[in-house]
Structures are given as C-alpha cells and as structure tokens.
C-alpha cells in the first residue's frame, strides 16, 4: 500500500470525451470509508455527472461490458451475420445505444479494446475474454480505428464507410 489512509482513497472512472459523457464509475475497494464514497458521489454530482458505485475489479462494470459487446459484434461481423453498419444500427435502434459497438470500438481504438480484453482474460483466467482473431488481425495490420483512418470502418472526412474486406 502506498498510503497510510486507504479509507480516503477513491477511484473515479470517467468516459471520453469527459465533458460530454454523463457517467462516472466510483470505485469501491476494501479499505474505503462510506464517507469517501459519499464525497466522490457529491463531487460527481457537482460536475454534472451521474455516478454508479462498483467494486475494484478488472474492467469495473462498464469497460467489462463494453469490450465483451464489442468483441461479440466483431465475431458477428467475421461470421457474416450482418454488415458493420447493420450490427451498429441494430444496437442503436433495438437497444437505444447512442453508438453501435463497432463504431465505439473504432472510436476508442481497436488496440485499446484488444489490450483490455487480454487483460480481462489474464485477470480472470478465462479465455472467453480473448480478442476475436479479426480484432487481432486488424490491430496487427495497424488498422486501429478512427485515429488511423481505418479500423472496422473506413474513416474519410469524418464519415464512416463499411469496409468491403470484412465480413459481409
């Protein structure tokens, strides 16, 4: 431990872009006091954020769910279930997600997604978290998403297009 007062230490996981994303995860660990959790909730509220409290586990709640959903969407794309844009539309219209899992993966960075999945697989000793081979292929080719102009989608002048060489 690097502190004499672990009861006063809290983690807060913000989402990018921070000014636009309303959620913050407040990370509870074994030694934290309820007062510290309450102060973190208050701080989040004063920043205009909604907060959830999660235990200190790999991936917390949101990253763990997000990367698994993204990895499954990549699997579906590789299997030819639907095009990338149709998979994303299914989640936007069918589940009211503001952005589909494939577009979000491109925004976050496919390399980041892969690193998180590998970290979860190692932490939980569970190969179900391993990145799909298509994700590995894209990252190894340097197709990392929006930041490189190519990932699941082709990113032109701010517009995205389905790639012809992936899935359908």
Residue spans for each PLM region:
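Alpha-helix N-cap/N′ positions at the starts of helices
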Residues: 19, 65-69, 97
């Amino acid at each position: 431990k690097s502190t004499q007062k672990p009861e006063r230490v809290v983690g807060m996981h913000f989402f990018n872009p921070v000014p636009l994303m309303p959620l913050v995860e407040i990370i509870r660990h074994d030694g934290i006091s309820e007062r510290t959790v309450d102060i973190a909730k208050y701080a989040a509220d004063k920043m205009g954020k909604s907060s959830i409290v999660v235990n200190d586990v790999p991936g917390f709640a949101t990253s763990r769910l997000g990367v698994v959903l993204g990895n499954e969407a990549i699997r579906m794309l590789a299997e030819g279930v639907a095009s990338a844009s149709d998979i994303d539309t299914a989640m936007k219209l069918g589940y009211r997600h503001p952005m589909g899992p494939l577009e979000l993966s491109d925004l976050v960075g496919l390399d980041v997604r892969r690193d998180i999945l590998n970290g979860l697989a190692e932490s939980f000793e569970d190969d179900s978290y391993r990145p799909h081979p298509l994700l590995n292929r894209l990252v190894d080719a340097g197709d990392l998403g929006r930041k490189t102009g190519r990932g699941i989608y082709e990113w032109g002048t701010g517009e995205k297009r389905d790639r012809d060489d992936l899935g359908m």
